[in-house]
């Protein structure tokens, strides 16, 4: 009972922060890739790639909840963490902007499959309530932030643990590289959709990556440090085990 109360308190804190982001006036920069920015063929292609990931995520989510119903509150906490961090925007490139992703914690606790669902829910609410991203571009944003970024973070986490690195170092690398991988994919998405007239898609991807890096590298480092702090608090309060879930 005490454990569930702690989780509910943490989740309510995340919800309060999310509501604050909704009521505080914000400048109208689009979060992620904004609605209507991608050509229809690319928007559809990314949606077709994202749908099987959603199906797999639902299977994983159902299995986790069936095995331990108390995980629902921890899942809500991870979802709130993703929502709050990914709603902090730093304008970077026309049609998109830099921000933390917040997926590292959920990746460590539940694996990348569940993050596809959490990320999709977050992106949907941000598109509908905050005008961040969009419905037509949700497939592209979901593939970058909720699928490929988390998969990279998960692989880094597993390799770091097998290499015997300190737990805090492994958490930091997972969160930071999941963030950077997200923006690498976003750069590719924008680059192939809008190739450079002279250098082609490759040149366009490099340009997008170069501009994103100016803000995203320090943001990713900060996200890694914050995730370490949150993970450390969850373990100290015995909300999770040291090994994660």
Swiss-Prot record:
Recorded topology in the membrane: Multi-pass membrane protein
Location in the cell: Cell inner membrane
One matching Pfam family: CbiM
Any single biological process term in GO: cobalamin biosynthetic process
GO cellular component: ATP-binding cassette (ABC) transporter complex
InterPro entries in alphabetical order: CbiM, CbiM/NikMN
Keywords annotated in UniProt: Cell inner membrane, Cell membrane, Cobalamin biosynthesis, Cobalt, Cobalt transport, Ion transport, Membrane, Signal, Transmembrane, Transmembrane helix, Transport
Pathway: Cofactor biosynthesis; adenosylcobalamin biosynthesis
Lineage top rank: taxon: Bacteria
Transmembrane domains' residue ranges: 36-56, 73-93, 105-125, 137-157, 169-189, 210-230
Signal peptide: 1-30
Similarity section: Belongs to the CbiM family.
PANTHER family, per database record: COBALT TRANSPORT PROTEIN CBIM, PTHR43627
Protein's UniProt name: Cobalt transport protein CbiM
Originating species: Salmonella typhimurium (strain LT2 / SGSC1412 / ATCC 700720)
């Amino acid at each position: 009972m005490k454990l569930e109360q702690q989780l509910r308190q943490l989740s309510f804190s995340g919800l309060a922060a999310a509501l604050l982001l909704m009521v505080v006036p914000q400048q109208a920069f689009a979060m992620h890739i904004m609605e209507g920015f991608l050509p229809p063929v690319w928007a559809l292609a990314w949606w077709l790639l994202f749908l099987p990931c959603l199906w797999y995520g639902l299977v994983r989510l159902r299995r986790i909840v069936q095995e331990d119903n108390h995980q629902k509150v921890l899942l809500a906490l991870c979802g709130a963490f993703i929502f709050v961090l990914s709603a902090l925007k730093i304008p970077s490139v026309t049609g998109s902007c830099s921000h933390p992703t917040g997926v590292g914690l959920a990746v460590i606790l539940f694996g990348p499959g569940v993050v596809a669902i959490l990320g999709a829910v977050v992106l949907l609410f941000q598109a509908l309530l905050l005008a961040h991203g969009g419905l037509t571009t949700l497939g592209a944003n979901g593939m970058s932030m909720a699928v490929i970024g988390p998969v990279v973070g998960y692989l880094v986490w597993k390799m770091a643990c097998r290499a015997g690195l300190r737990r805090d170092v492994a958490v930091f690398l997972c969160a930071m590289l999941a963030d950077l991988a997200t923006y690498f994919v976003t750069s590719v998405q924008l680059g192939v959709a809008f190739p450079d007239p002279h250098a082609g898609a490759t040149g366009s991807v490099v340009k997008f990556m170069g501009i994103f890096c100016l803000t995203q590298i320090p943001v990713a480092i900060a996200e890694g440090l914050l995730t370490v702090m949150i993970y450390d608090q969850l373990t100290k309060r015995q909300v999770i085990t040291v090994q994660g879930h």
